[in-house]
């Protein structure tokens, strides 16, 4: 299933990338926009209580390679923050987010790709969702996970305030291990990830 999702992504972005110059040549001549990407893939977590995933790290590497290829837009390697397994701590993820916000400008394109575990808390009525980083503990993921509310705020700030195009791609597996319940977990995580504004593209596979 994960391979099918990855294949769909590569096919989709190949079409989008190839078609863009044709759509833009008619009316708009401007400086070439830059592309930045945060690509995260975590298969092996620090906390042994968090189940391992088989292909998340490899999927992230494949996506980063695609972005650097001609069909993916020839994105310079220095414009891609690739965070795999133990490198993908909450601190490094936040650092990468700030790096993008400090560098992107109007009409740029920003990719945020995450493949790994997603989870939601079941204490509040909001059922807030989180993306689980490498060093996020299973017993305190609310404090050391990447809040989807925070991620949505970042994405909206870049798309609305900076006026850059943002593409959010998440392949987040919800196991229910950290909350003790699988009930509607993938629905809530996926629903929160799909709250988008103008100038944003979002794709989520939540299982």
Task: Please identify what each model-predicted range represents.
Residues 19, 23, 27, 34, ...:
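Caspase-like (clan CD) cysteine peptidase catalytic core
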